[in-house]
Amino acid sequence: SPQVAVDCIRVNFEIPVLLTQAFLNETRSWKGERRVMNISSGAGRKSVPGWAMYCSTKAALDRFTAVTAEDQLGKPNPARLSAVAPGVVNTGMQGSIRASSKEDFPNVDRFIDLEKDGKLQSPEDTAKRLLNYLNSDEFGKEPISDIRNISVGD
């Protein structure tokens, strides 16, 4: 529906963009290091049937983060940015996905199997890995990253 599309754009793209821009503007005179981590998704990097809005808004967030990171390079005290895919995390969204019909979401069986096989990451472990990455020297070297591919001292 149009409202679902608007909500998806707002949550996955508009709000992170506005927060990022506000942070960068308000902190541009800071002497300390500035870092911005936007939470992306692997779905923004490939097509997932039934997820047109989710995939496209996460792809837009990836591109916004990458361009903003590049724009920062020429500035005094440039901020480091990265759009990070956190992996498949056992959140409320996962429950909603698994409750989907095959008609609405053709890949539903894959997500049911991920839970059944214990392959979902816990929110707590994911948050720890994201914070470790945010605080590491590696943060921002790649403006688009996937936490599953980064060694962050687990």
Specify the residue positions occupied by each region the protein language model found.
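Active-site loop-to-helix junction immediately N-terminal to the catalytic Tyr of the SDR YXXXK motif
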Residues: 47-55, 67
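Active-site helix of classical SDR
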Residues: 20, 57
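Substrate-binding pocket helix/loop in short-chain dehydrogenase/reductase
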Residues: 1-6
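C-terminal helical subdomain
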Residues: 83-84, 91, 99-154
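A short helix-coil junction within the Rossmann-fold of NAD(P)-dependent oxidoreductases
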Residues: 22-33
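Alpha-helical segment proximal to the catalytic Tyr-Lys
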Residues: 25, 70-74
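Residue(s) in the substrate-gating loop at a strand-loop-helix junction
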Residues: 41
